[in-house]
Regions:
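N-proximal low-complexity "stem/linker" segments adjacent to membrane-targeting elements
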Residues: 1-20
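Short beta-strand/turn micro-motifs composed of small residues
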Residues: 8-10, 35-37, 105
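Short, solvent-exposed loop/turn segments at secondary-structure junctions
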Residues: 11-14, 39-42, 58-61, 108-111, ...
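Short, acidic, metal-binding catalytic loop of nucleotide-sugar glycosyltransferases
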Residues: 22-32
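Active-site-proximal specificity loops/subdomain of glycosyltransferases
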Residues: 38, 42-97
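GT-A fold catalytic core of metal-dependent nucleotide-sugar glycosyltransferases
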Residues: 83-127
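Short glycine- and hydrophobic/aromatic-rich loop-to-beta-strand nucleating segment
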Residues: 131-137
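Catalytic core and acceptor-binding pocket of nucleotide-sugar-dependent glycosyltransferases
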Residues: 143-185
């Protein structure tokens, strides 16, 4: 089983600094990166060996998300995906099944040697901000966002407003209320 995969969903053109992000990802060869989006990746090829691009339209991703829930989800623009990040373990569970941990990452997060900063204790969740959060990849933990304590994912996924579900008022608070081990820097 591999240790960690980090997921990013991005739509539109990658920013000018994306090549720097790719270089920082390449330097973290023990971590895989899954990129979902509709961007033209050809000018960045060949991608580093640990970076995988999954071409998907925003509409197809919305359809995939909707298919996993029994209520209408609201996802008017790609930026709203920040509230769906805690559900990536559930939404992409087939893609990440061979990893011990999964996380979400923003492509404006230029990495140093990330593995040096990963705690060696057994936490269910690492870090507290949306640009980089890591979760233990278990069936229960990947559905933790659905727990009744803290923000209600149904309300979060049913509004066009950004609720910061991926950060302090969302998942960090939920894990704290559920008394689940997390490392929040």
């Amino acid at each position: 089983m591999k240790k960690l995969v980090l997921i990013s969903a991005y739509f539109g053109e990658y920013p000018d600094y994306f090549n720097l992000w790719l270089k920082s990802a390449a330097q973290n060869s023990g971590i895989d990166f899954f990129l979902y989006g509709d961007c033209d990746i050809s000018k960045y090829e060949p991608l580093p060996q640990n970076v995988y691009f999954f071409k998907i339209s925003f509409q197809d991703l919305k359809n995939k998300i909707q298919s996993r829930f029994d209520f209408p989800v609201i996802l008017p623009k790609p930026y709203k995906l920040c509230d769906y990040k805690p559900a990536y373990g559930y939404l992409f569970e087939d893609d990440i099944k061979n990893y011990e941990y999964w996380g979400h990452i923003d492509i404006d997060t230029i990495l140093g040697d990330l593995e040096k900063f990963l705690p060696h204790k057994d936490y269910e969740k690492l870090y507290q901000f949306g640009h980089l959060t890591i979760y233990k990849n278990t069936y229960k933990n990947n559905r933790r966002f659905m727990e009744n304590r803290g923000q209600d994912y149904r309300k979060v996924f049913s509004t066009s407003f950004i609720t910061v579900f991926d950060e302090l008022p969302g998942m960090t608070k939920k894990f704290k209320l559920l008394n689940i081990p997390q490392y929040a820097s």
